Amino acid sequence: MDEIHGEVSPPAINRSNGALVSDNISQVVEGVDNVERPAKVAKGYSAANRPPPELPHITNNVIPLSNVLKFYTQEAFKQITTLVENLASTKDSEDDSVRKKKFLELIIALRQDFIKIYTLVKWAANSKDVSRFIDLLNWLRMQEFYFDQLTFQLNALNGYSGAKLPNSDLITSLEVLFKGRPQLPSYNYIKIPKISPEKTLEVMQDLNLILMTRIALIDIPKRFINNYVIKDGRIYFSVPNEFQVSITVANDMIIESHDEYTKSPFYFIDFKFLFGINPDTSLITHRDNKIVTKLPRSSHENLEKIVNATLLNQGLHGLYDLLHKFSISFKLYLIAKQLKELQINTRWRNNLQVNYQNGKSLIILNYWSGQYLSKGWKSFIELGIDRNYNLNFRWFKNGKYNVNTELSALFNKHLKNTNEGEEEKDDSTDDIEEPEDLNVDLILNIVVNKHSELLMSKVFNSLDAKLNTTDNPDQISYITPHQLLIKSSPTKSTIFCINPLTGLFYFIDPCPVQNLIAKKINSPPTVVKNKNFVAESDMVNTIVDGLTQLRLEIFNKEIHNRLLTTEWINNDIIGLNDYEISRLSNFFANSLDYNLNVNKIQFYRRKNWPSSWFLINLVSGVTSVTFWWVARIKSVSGEWKIQWIQKLHLNEKTPSVEITDDPTNLNFEFFNNLSTACSNMIIDHMLLEELFKRNIKFLKVDNTALILQKFNIDKIPDDEDTQDTDDKNKPLIYESIIMIYNDNNLLPVYNSATSLFLKIKLINLNNLTQMKLKLFGKLRNLSIRNSPENFLQLNLKIDEIKNFFEIDDLINLSSRTNGSDSASSATTNHLLDKIFNNLNKLNKLIKILDQLNKNKIQIINNSVNDIIIKIDDNLDNLIIKLPEKATDSIKLISEEEVKDGGNPEVKLILDYLNKYLSNYYSDDFFANDEDKFYDGNKKTSIVGIIKYLKEINPILKSVQTIKAKLRKPESAFKLSNGLSKLNFDIKFTTLNLIQYVFHMNYQTPSSSKKIFKDKIVISLSFKNNKFDKVSKNLIKISLKDNLNSKNLKYKKLFELIFKSINDGSMDAHAHQLIKLNYDFLVNSSLVGELMVRIANCFVLYLQAESNGRYNQ
């Protein structure tokens, strides 16, 4: 593009529509390229006379269309030529269709390329317009670049301002024009004649007279009245404690009106401050002329210019306003300087921040800069000039400006006679009392002390309201306005203070807990840590919470130490959830808001306590009251659950135990008694819980004598082992009586009563805790053949004269609870096992004997452990062994089995009976029902079992007879290998199903070494005949189990069996046999004979078979 020279004419204005139209741009957009661009448009030349230059054409990265067509044409020709040559060379090796296919693929590929070229040619027909737009875009970008360069060059011209020539000296030219010569400086080479003293005195006196006249005729500021002196040709205005200024006039004109003042204004002569730094005290003093502060020369000259301008424009009123502001500002400067020194070299270091802003004439003092309530300019004092241009202050705290009349009075005392508008005192008063020095340190002390006092007052009121000290006023009291005496526990007090210098709280002679609480109090509250502003109420609440927490921690630590001293063991692993904690509040008479900052829960236990038993202690930091519970706590699915809990009732007395909830009585005796009371409660609960698990109804007896008298019991039996022991060696720890309801399960009511009594006594012997249990009550109508010595095995004593019994048990709790956790838990949960096992043995002994006697069953002998009875002459005596535990059942044993093993069938039957009794044993066992034996129901009785044994006795005798017969030589049939052809076995499937199993062994001619075995089963079961009251029980003989194809070979055997049964029905016992197809119902007295006959059939069958009468 050609370079553009010359100037650019402004755009033409279209008068018709007011739009600016650029001729050059419009021509370019219209595409007029052949018009030359004008070189100049100045000096009368028009822009339309010369056409603009052509747009430069862009040819970079542009490929001619001819080159593209040439390349693709040559490439297509080359590919066709190469393929034709290749196809000619593969004429013999490739199929003609394959060669044609390759040629077709090449033609299709070239066709696609030429379609693209065709599209490109069509597009090239319109490419001229596209190329022109590209050229135009390039030209516009170049124009933008040239304009940017023009801007840079124009800015560069500003750097040549120093090369300009100076302006002409018009003043000297005018002086030469009027005077004919310039007035050049003399440089003191021309001597000036001296003025005589008389002339000077005369002028001074004239000036004094003129000034007196001027002052008399004009209005002067209020604070200048009576505070000026005219002498030495000037007026001295003195504002007490602020400044002194001297002014004069330049001529002797008498000004009578304000409009003429500009003809003879006042002029500034001298100035000084009537205050300054006292070299003795380094404080700002206001002792008028005794200590003054003069300005440096440069400051004095600047002030002279400003004052003269002010006097010219505003007169004396403007002068006073200016110098009054200047004095107050300078005073602020001196105060700021003093504060800077305090900030660096005094005790205020790191506790004070000063922000002195010259432009605003304001000093901001941020005290307690290290305390979070004031840190970051949240509590400060502003010293500055108010709207009346007086030195004043504002106190900002708790997020707002505060007005404190007491603090304002103290400030005014130190700033008196400084501010405008204050009344001037009489001369006599000024002579007596001089103004005090302005002590910034004292002012700061006043502020921080007052703020500290206010904070401590709020803390006192809030803590007093929280602790509710109406009934106990000694909980909190004042020592000084900055110190509080707080009762941290019933026996200790602490002094809580605030440091006015730093604003931090602390304790005097602190312990580690107090140090932690002080650190917490001096830290921002957790609830407002994310806020920029912390209100004093939040701070006070944090302090009160911290002090409450301190009381809680100290009181809790005292209790903790005393518990540890008295051999309590702390458990800090247990943590109860909110639900479990809420269960504790159910015991409070008044609602108690559980808060970790107000109350604290601790868990303790004794070394000899059962596992999972704990003493829970809750200490209140508000009321200093302790709460105690005894609880059993276990971990369930990772969470601690309270299984049982009972509040420890204080202010109650038991033998040798007296505890109270008065915090002042938490001494060694209290905690020693606490251990005893808790242990008693645990033992008491464990006994009651064990009674509950045994489904025994009970009632704790408070008035023992009345209850015993009601049930005709004279008194509680005395302990023989404690009668001869003095109380010092075996002191009584705890004693209680529980009345137990006897619902005929513990003892027969016929022989006893509906109420039994359990006496519990805890004694301490040689530092070992023992529990003596005594179960006693009425007992009568006994038929036991035991001697008293025999009952000693059960710790049982029976007084048949008084119809009274008692069972004793002595348990060493120390040895039981000192074992391993699992062992101690198992033993301590079964404290009543022995005494109730003995009672259960007595109960069963009475009930079984009563049942046997009522059913006239012969009792051979009885003891506390077993009963020997006679069932039948053909059966051995039966021993009924009583269980050792209440949960066990009785056990039946044959007397012969004890001696020499006995009958195996009888032993098998008894094993079945014992197994059944262990599974289905119930109280119905002692029912007087002869028909209750095992018949498919889950009930039985001892009478039913005895009758069952009588009924099954013929079967057992038949089994013995069959076995004896088969052992005889004439019945012993052998195979070729010596094995018996017939084997007999008895099978007890259940007590109601007995099977006679006959095994038939044989050999086949084809396999003489192989033994085959067939089984023939005859089943016996008991059936109840409801229509016959005399002979109710029948025995069913069934042959249905043999109905199978394998037993067809034994047709002759079954014919013999049925014939034998039919022959038995022809005699006198025919009425006792009932035929049912393959089953027979017979009386128990006939079943033995029939089974022997059936066994003889097997022998007869084998004899006939051996004689060749039957073929397999």
Curated annotation (Swiss-Prot):
UniProt keyword annotations, A-Z: Activator, Nucleus, Transcription, Transcription regulation
Region forming the signal peptide: none
GO biological processes: regulation of transcription by RNA polymerase II
A GO cellular-component term linked to this record: mediator complex
Origin superkingdom: Eukaryota
Keyword Metal-binding tagged: no
Keyword field contains Nucleus: yes
InterPro entries: Med14_N, Mediator_Med14
GO molecular function, one term: transcription coregulator activity
Compartment(s): Nucleus
Pfam families on file: Med14
Oligomeric and partner information: Component of the Mediator complex.
Role of this protein: Component of the Mediator complex, a coactivator involved in the regulated transcription of nearly all RNA polymerase II-dependent genes. Mediator functions as a bridge to convey information from gene-specific regulatory proteins to the basal RNA polymerase II transcription machinery. Mediator is recruited to promoters by direct interactions with regulatory proteins and serves as a scaffold for the assembly of a functional preinitiation complex with RNA polymerase II and the general transcription factors.
Sequence similarity: Belongs to the Mediator complex subunit 14 family.
Annotated protein name in UniProt: Mediator of RNA polymerase II transcription subunit 14
Encoding gene per record: RGR1
